[in-house]
Structure formats: structure tokens, C-alpha cells
């Protein structure tokens, strides 16, 4: 129990420090041009073992080049936060989806979809708030900071983001990235 609680407290402290650095601007952006589809492919590959262990399926829909300008390390953190969130809200089918969709005017729309319980409309405005936990999250592990960190990173990049959700069907978290200049 002591080891578990120490790990939990350590994760919380690390999340608070990460959020503080990103929110304050202490962690500076290092934007470069890169293919977001390729980053999605690399990040999805890191979920192979956990998916196999749990009988889950991560569907990757990132078949077309999706050139963007952003900080790839920060975008990787966003992907891990959203995919981790999806694994906590996995539906009975065990499927979650990562999409990188080229936008007509350039750039890329990224979506992470789960087939879980969905989020009631009255909770949607609070999802990205610090420490906010949706009612169905009561008793689940986590710091309640992952979506706040995601929000801070996306705001620092000036990327629009949001969530679409239907109770009983699941949720899709999305953000839109700018094309290289």
C-alpha cells in the first residue's frame, strides 16, 4: 500500500509541475515542421503491449501525410494524455481510435475516440478544468490533470480543441493543427 500511494503521490506531483511549467510559459515551444500522421503511428506503437495485455484494439487511421508546424514533444504528450484518457473510458468492445485527418486548407485534425459511457452535456464545459473528474470517474486512478495539461499545450500552440460526446455511445476528443507556413 505504501509503495502504491508513493507512486500515486509522485505522479500527482509530476503532473502539477508539468501543468505549472506549461501554463506559465516556462516551458518554451520548439515548433518544427513534421508529419503528424507519422507521430501518431509512433505513439500508437507504444500501446501495442498494453492493448495485447488487456485485449484492446487501438485503431490507427493516419494513412495520409499530415504536415503541421508544432512542438512534436508537446504533441506527443497531448496524444498520450488523450489515449490514456480513452483507455480509462474503454467501452465493452475494447476499441479506441486515433485519427490524423488532413484538413482541406492544410494542417491536420487529430481525433481520439472511445466507445465508453460518454459524458453528460452538463459536464462537458468542465472537462478541461484542473482536477475536474466526471461523475463516472469516481474511484478511478489518475490525477485529474491530464486534460488540463492538454488544454495548456494546445492553447500555447493556439490550436482549437474540444470534445463531442453522446451518453451511452462514447466521446471524441479533437484538436486542429496549423499547416507549416
Give a label for each model feature:
Residues 119-131:
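Short conserved segment of the HATPase_c
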Residues 50-59:
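Short conserved segments within the C-terminal catalytic ATPase subdomain
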Residues 86-87:
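Short helix-loop "hinge" at the ATP-lid/N-box region of the Bergerat-fold HATPase_c
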Residues 24-29, 67-70:
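Conserved micro-motifs of the catalytic ATP-binding
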Residues 4-9:
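Short alpha-helical segment of the dimerization/phosphotransfer core of two-component systems
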Residues 158-159:
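Conserved glycine-rich
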Residues 30-45:
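A conserved beta-strand-to-alpha-helix junction within the catalytic ATP-binding
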Amino acid at each position: 500500500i505504501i509503495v502504491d500511494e508513493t507512486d500515486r503521490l509522485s505522479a500527482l506531483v509530476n503532473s502539477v509541475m508539468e501543468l505549472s511549467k506549461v501554463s506559465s510559459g516556462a516551458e518554451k515551444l520548439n515548433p518544427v515542421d513534421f508529419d503528424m500522421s507519422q507521430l501518431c503511428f509512433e505513439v500508437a506503437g507504444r500501446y501495442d503491449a498494453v492493448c495485447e495485455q488487456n485485449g484492446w484494439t487501438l485503431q490507427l487511421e493516419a494513412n495520409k501525410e499530415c504536415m503541421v508546424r508544432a512542438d512534436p514533444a508537446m504533441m506527443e504528450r497531448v496524444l498520450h494524455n488523450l489515449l490514456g484518457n480513452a483507455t480509462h473510458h474503454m467501452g465493452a468492445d475494447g476499441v479506441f481510435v486515433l485519427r490524423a485527418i488532413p484538413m482541406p486548407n492544410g494542417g491536420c485534425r487529430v481525433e481520439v475516440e472511445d466507445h465508453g459511457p460518454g459524458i453528460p452535456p452538463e459536464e462537458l464545459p468542465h472537462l478541461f478544468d484542473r482536477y475536474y473528474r466526471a461523475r463516472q470517474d469516481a474511484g478511478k486512478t489518475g490525477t485529474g490533470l491530464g486534460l488540463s495539461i492538454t488544454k495548456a499545450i494546445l492553447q500555447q500552440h493556439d490550436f482549437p480543441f474540444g470534445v463531442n460526446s453522446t451518453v451511452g455511445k462514447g466521446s471524441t476528443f479533437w484538436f486542429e493543427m496549423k499547416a507549416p507556413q
